[in-house]
Amino acid sequence: RDLHSFPTRRSSDLNGGMDARTKVQVGPEYRPITSEYLDYDEVLDKYDKMMDWLARVYVRTLNVIHYMHDKYYYEAAEMALIDTDVRRTFATGIAGFSHVVDSLSAIKYAKVKTVRDENGVVVDFETEGDFPRYGNDDDRADEIAVWLLKTFMAQDRKSTRLNSSHHGM
């Protein structure tokens, strides 16, 4: 599974940084959510903290990738042909964005019950009721999407970029 996938992060947030499938600690360890039904504010607090950690890991990983591109000459020949000041950009992205918006929307506007394994690890969810979904022109879901994007970008911008690149998404 993709460590940088937002839905994967959401799952490990609920389990105190542990991956539900592998039972391996994949993020910072902290107290898992133990309630039967998910509370929006509690989930958002843990998700925000996990996103902050994830943004740092993500940028460090991309810095290594960009450094290796520079080191092994992938773009050096092309860059030599540019006769002006180069404005470097550093693009990041959010895998699973709509899934997380929908998940947070379900927690906020419906009732989401956790399904746990024999060890108490959240492995699934049961949603009772309806909730606004991303991409359906509903301001309630859009507000969650805007919060998610702004929050992640603010956390993302805290990290130093290779070659003083400009932030992008």
Please give the residue ranges for each predicted region:
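Structured mid-domain segments that build the active-site/substrate or prosthetic-cofactor binding neighborhood
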Residues: 1, 5, 9-133
